Amino acid sequence: MTSKNKIELLTEHLIKIISETNGISLADTLELAVMGDSKSDHPLIKKSIQEFRRLINDFHSDEIDIKTLLNHPVSQALFGFFKRFPRPYIEEHIHLTGSLSAEFIHPHLMKLLEGPDRRIYFSIIDKVYGPGCAENIKTVSDVDQLIRLKEDEFFDRYLKILLLPKLILTTKEMHAAAAYHMARELYNKYNVGMIRLKFTLSRATQSSDEQIPGLENLTEEDVVLGLYDGFMAFKKKVPEFDFVLSPCFRKEEDFFDATKFKTKKEHFLHQVDAILELLEKYPFLNPYLCEVDTVGSEKDLFRKGHFAQMQQGFRKLHFKGFSIRSHHGETWHTLKRGVQAVDNALNIWHIDALEHGLSLGINPNFYFHSLYRRLIVDNERGAKVKVGSSDWKELMDMDWREHTSIREKLISGDPLLESERREFVKVKFHTAREVEHYQHDVLNRMIHKGVGLIALPSSNNKLTNSFSDYKDHPFSWWEKKGLKLGVGTDNYITLNTNYIQELLILLFTDAENLKITKLLMVATGETRRPYLSQLLWKMRGHSTHKS
């Protein structure tokens, strides 16, 4: 039996079990898939599923990593199941720059690198990737290597390596080509029928690393109409495909056009007016240009004052019927500030959906006790706490009252007395309790207001140090709490993932409790359970799918 035939048989077998059990949990599905000894059972299929069940257990006991699961034939069969599901998925969170393949970028990039301004592009690329890198870009594989995040790279590097797509996205026509390419790839390869695209309306900035030739001639109108044209061209071929254009605004103070505007607020209000003028000029955009988002590093933007610059503009958009979404709770200096950033986004910007929201999924008791254990072990060895590190920031943010000397001993590496250790336990305990209360207060307000929360497992795992493994992702906890959830990939090419892989990761991380039907409901937006049951039943015996 070939590998392809084996995966096809596994897929059909799993479709049969899932449809007959109405999409129960993965663990129960796999148990039923090997139960008994029917004459129709194929021994190799049964053996493969039994092996995968053991691997699931090994994954949850930290014996193997998620890659081992994702590469297994049963995982590939489950991929086939999700790809064949008759109802396409909603990609709730995807950016343009990190979701363009090397095959698309390469020919357009080579025109720049071989053109009259090549030295300018060489300089820009070499600043990010190192001296001589640009001259060595020749093949699609070369580009692919540069646009993907490495295992030892994190958030700050991630923002920088989005450069190559930015270099080519300088015209209306290129935005149209990029949108069409994205729609075709996601629909045909990953059964995504609705895209909520995050894109930059204006890339003007004071940052020297982002001064790209051609940007000075690219207008907001070019960007929006280009993306619209590209998506609509695909929609004409595939009528069920749909999309929302979600312009993103960088939160950082220095991301504005200082050559034309005195302040970030002034530039932001100009962009808001530009969006509204576009809708007035081109009414056909109304169903598609109906929300905005904020992006960028939020570590230093958590206080109420940090939200004031964009408040007026968001208020204006709200009154025009726009939804406001925001990237918050993704990165932070301290966990409390991560929650505070979400809190202020809710109260000041009145967001309709929260993207990432990881600070609302970290267990404060586990988080702070891990910090305690880590620092006590280091203290016993006489190790200092590095000034400016995340541990140092958490220590500095705790309320030590009259016990600041304990904090200073931890930082300097002076051994703590037993009584001082007990006091440290009390301080971290009350800090955890306070943050936990704050978390639940914010989460309950989100539930009450119907604010959505978009989960991005690979992005959260690879770009932050907030949890050590995929299985610690809070998706299942959020689902049990009753939050309105969605799933996104962020920049799927950059992060080496895809939409169906994100679904598999969520399924594997809570194999015992997360029901397949519930995951399908989140992914498709379909809430009619009987209808979903019928769709599962219709999959039986139908091996044809998008190609």
What do the predicted segments below correspond to?
Residues 2-547:
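Metal-cofactor-binding active-site regions of metalloenzymes
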